[in-house]
Amino acid sequence: MKKKLLDAIINKKKENVSFAIITNLENGEGCIFEKDKPLDKNFNKFEKKINSYFDKKKNGIIDETNIFVETYILPIKVFIVGAVHIAQYLVSFAKTLNFEITIIDPRGYFASKKRFPNINIINKWPKEAFEEIKPDKDSALIALTHDPKIDDPALQYAINNNFFYIGALGSKKTHENRCARLKKSGFSDVQIKKIFGPIGIKLGGKTAPEIALSIISQLVSEVYKQK
C-alpha cells in the first residue's frame, strides 16, 4: 500500500466516517471511496459495483476485475430514551447486531450502570443530552418512557435532524395524543408520519422481550430500506 493512500486511510478514521478502500491488485494503485463524493477517475468505470459493495457492507474482489473493495462502515447509532424494562432487552439485541447504543434518561435510578453495564448512559433530559453527542444520518431513536416531558423533546430532535428511524412506545390512543402535541408544536403531518407509533412490527407478543424483538426487527428492516 502506498504512503499517500495509507495517510488518507488514517485521516478518514480520525474523521470517524464510513468509507471504503479501493485497490487495483494488479498495479497497487488505490483510493478512498465515500458515498456521494467524486471517485478517483482511475476507478470511475467500477463506481456502480463499488457502490453496491459499500451499500451491502461487503468486502471482496469485483467480479472479473483486479479491483478489491474493503469497507469501513460506522455502526448504526441507537439512542434509547427511557431506561425501562424493555430497554434492557433492546440493548441485548442491539449489542448482538453491533449497534452503538446510548441510553438517555434523566432518572438516574432507572438509567444506572448496574442495570445497563458497559453501555453509554446520559442522565440528562434529551435536549441537554443531544447537545453532548453527535447523531448523524445513521442514527435511530427509540422513545420508551410514555412521559411527554421526556419523549417529546427527543422525538422533535430526531425529526429535525433526519434520523433514519424514529419510534415511540404506546397505544394507538397514546400515539394520537403524541401526534396532536407535535402538530401543535408546529410539525407537519409529513414530519409526524416519520414516527413509528405504536412502535415495532406486529408479532403479537406481549412480554418485554417480545416487544423488544418487534422493535429491533422493525429497526433492522429500516436499516436495509436505506440501501
Regions found by a protein language model. Give the residues of each.
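Adenosine-phosphate binding glycine-rich loop
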Residues: L169-K227
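A short acidic, amphipathic alpha-helical/loop segment
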Residues: F93, P153-Y157
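Segments forming oxygen-rich coordination pockets for charged ligands
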Residues: M1-P117, T174, A180-K183, Q218-K227
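Conserved beta-strand segments of alpha/beta enzyme cores
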Residues: E100, N120, Q191-K194
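Short amphipathic alpha-helix with an adjacent loop that forms part of the alpha/beta core around
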Residues: K127-K137
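Beta-loop-alpha module in the N-terminal Rossmann-like domain of NAD(P)-dependent dehydrogenases
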Residues: P148-D152
